[in-house]
């Protein structure tokens, strides 16, 4: 009887041991996973590297919305994008990209965001459109006047002006929502025989990702500079993380600023030797 009664007890003890072990492993594993930086690349990626290689004669740096309202503490959206802009060291990284692109002699293009009074009379809008209009982001007094533009949130960041206002940078007509379907970015790129794009700017999960998707569908080869983009952080989600996942899935390259500058510099040297 003693032997029989000990069997359930042994089984019960073993079951408790297994349960505690599994729970402990799960908790520890979960803690370890949670401790990993949210934006860190996987240690063993399952997706192949597309192997994008720059040809400077066919390359352009396209920067989206490099404007005060998106990138400056003085901007109207700073309360929702400021944390991400700061985390990514966005403005210094973009400055480095501008400088490297100019030194390498590649085309530089700006796809800006402007809203005019008639844009505030739209009959229907999405959530982010409403938010932008409520904040009066990128507002200008009209398409044919620069009155009130200087120093406004629609103006380019002061750090970038030496590169943008050098007489060689192409400033496209404005996009209105997220993608470049309604401005002349693609036309300008095609007219310069550009088919490789280095993409940066704001906001990562909105305008940057929309430009990326449209460029890819039109046959461009596109690398996104992962620390030269940023996005809003809201209760609905982290826009940067959402974008980063999709960049990994669809872009021809997801590079850091360091990697991009190194690629531009290396190709510049190789071009100079030929």
Description of each model-found segment:
Residues 111-114, 202:
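Short, well-ordered beta-to-alpha junction loops that form the rim of enzyme active sites
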Residues 116-120:
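Short catalytic/ligand-binding loop motif for oxyanion handling, primarily in non-cytosolic enzymes
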Residues 62-64:
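Short hydrophobic beta-strand that contains or immediately precedes a catalytic carboxylate
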Residues 57-59, 75-101, 106-107, 112:
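A short alpha/beta connector and helix-capping loop motif
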Residues 2-19:
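Bacterial N-terminal signal peptides that target proteins for export
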Residues 66, 113, 227:
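Active-site loop/turn elements of alpha/beta-hydrolase fold enzymes
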Residues 34-60, 69, 96, 100-104, ...:
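Active-site-adjacent betaalpha module
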Residues 17-29:
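Bacterial N-terminal signal peptides
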């Amino acid at each position: 009887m003693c032997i029989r009664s000990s069997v359930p007890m042994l089984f019960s003890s073993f079951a408790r041991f297994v349960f505690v072990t599994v729970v402990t492993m799960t908790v520890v594993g979960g803690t370890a996973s949670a401790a990993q930086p949210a934006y860190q690349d996987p240690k063993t990626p399952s997706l192949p590297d597309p192997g994008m290689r720059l040809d400077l004669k066919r390359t352009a740096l396209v920067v989206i919305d490099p404007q005060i309202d998106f990138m400056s503490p003085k901007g109207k959206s700073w309360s929702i994008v400021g944390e991400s802009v700061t985390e990514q060291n966005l403005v210094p990284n973009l400055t480095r990209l501008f400088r490297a692109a100019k030194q390498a002699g590649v085309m530089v293009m700006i796809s800006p965001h402007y809203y005019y009074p008639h844009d505030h009379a739209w009959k229907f809008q999405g959530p982010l459109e409403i938010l932008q209009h409520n904040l009066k982001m990128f507002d200008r007094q009209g398409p044919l006047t620069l009155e009130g533009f200087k120093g406004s949130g629609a103006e380019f960041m002061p750090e970038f002006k030496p590169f943008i206002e050098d007489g060689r940078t192409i400033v496209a007509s404005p996009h209105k929502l997220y993608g470049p379907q309604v401005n002349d970015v693609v036309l300008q790129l095609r007219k310069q025989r550009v088919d490789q794009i280095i993409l940066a700017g704001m906001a990562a999960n909105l305008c940057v990702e929309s430009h990326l998707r449209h460029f890819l569908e039109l046959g461009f080869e596109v690398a996104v500079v992962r620390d030269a983009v940023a996005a809003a952080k809201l209760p609905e989600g982290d826009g940067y993380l959402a974008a980063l996942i999709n960049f990994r899935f669809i872009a021809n390259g997801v590079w850091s600023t360091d990697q991009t500058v190194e690629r531009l510099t290396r190709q510049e040297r190789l071009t100079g030797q030929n």
